[in-house]
């Protein structure tokens, strides 16, 4: 059996560009792509924390070290500059890989879209 699992997540990145007339996609700083184990043309889901929008597109390379998160084409209508987003990708993982310890790559971002930390799991949610 295969399971559809979270593979990659870039958490709380700020949108830096919205390019309506650029060919559709989301340009992501190459440093962030690599840290999250994402590749060019990979399908990604984007969840806008500010307005609740959820949509899918594909990743393209943004300038390395720039902090770029550019929503292009129709995706540009789903966010405004400065909105915080979660970028995620999923993969089909078989039971043997899961049993062998397969883990996702979770990347946490600071206010300048620079990496502030990594994890390989989502913590258990508790009551506060």
Curated annotation (Swiss-Prot):
GO biological process terms, alphabetically, are: alanine biosynthetic process; pantothenate biosynthetic process
Family membership: Belongs to the PanD family.
Q: What cofactor(s) does the depicted protein rely on?
A: pyruvate
Q: Where in the cell is it found?
A: Cytoplasm
Write down the InterPro entries for this protein, in alphabetical order: Asp_de-COase-like_dom_sf, Asp_decarbox
State its role. Answer: Catalyzes the pyruvoyl-dependent decarboxylation of aspartate to produce beta-alanine.
Cofactor note as given: Binds 1 pyruvoyl group covalently per subunit.
Assembly description: Heterooctamer of four alpha and four beta subunits.
In this chain, where does the modification Pyruvic acid (Ser) occur?
A: 25
Q: What class of enzyme is it?
A: lyase
Kindly report the protein's main subcellular placement as a broad class.
Answer: cytoplasm
> Could you tell me which Pfam families the record lists for this protein?
Asp_decarbox
List residues binding substrate.
57, 73-75
What protein does this entry describe? Aspartate 1-decarboxylase
Active-site positions on this chain: 25 (schiff-base intermediate with substrate), 58 (proton donor)
The record's section on SUPFAM superfamilies has:
ADC-like
GO cellular component terms attached to this protein's record: cytosol
Name the reaction it catalyses: L-aspartate + H(+) = beta-alanine + CO2
Instruction: Tell me what PTMs the record reports for this protein.
Output: Is synthesized initially as an inactive proenzyme, which is activated by self-cleavage at a specific serine bond to produce a beta-subunit with a hydroxyl group at its C-terminus and an alpha-subunit with a pyruvoyl group at its N-terminus.
Q: Which pathway, metabolic or otherwise, does it act in?
A: Cofactor biosynthesis; (R)-pantothenate biosynthesis; beta-alanine from L-aspartate: step 1/1
Keywords (alphabetical) are: Autocatalytic cleavage, Cytoplasm, Decarboxylase, Lyase, Pantothenate biosynthesis, Pyruvate, Schiff base, Zymogen
Query: Which molecular-function annotation in GO is an example for this chain?
Result: aspartate 1-decarboxylase activity
Q: Which EC numbers does the record give?
A: 4.1.1.11
């Amino acid at each position: 059996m295969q399971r559809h699992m979270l593979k990659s997540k870039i958490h709380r990145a700020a949108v830096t560009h919205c390019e309506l007339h650029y060919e559709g996609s989301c340009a992501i700083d190459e440093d962030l792509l690599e840290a999250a184990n994402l590749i060019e043309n990979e399908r990604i889901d984007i969840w806008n924390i500010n307005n609740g929008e959820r949509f899918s597109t594909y990743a393209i390379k943004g300038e390395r070290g720039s902090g770029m998160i550019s929503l292009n084409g129709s995706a540009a209508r789903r966010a405004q500059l400065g909105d915080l987003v979660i970028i995620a990708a999923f993969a089909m993982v078989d039971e043997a890989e899961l049993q062998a310890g397969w883990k996702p790559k979770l990347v946490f971002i600071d206010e300048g879209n620079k990496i502030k930390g990594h994890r390989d799991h989502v913590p258990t949610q508790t009551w506060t």
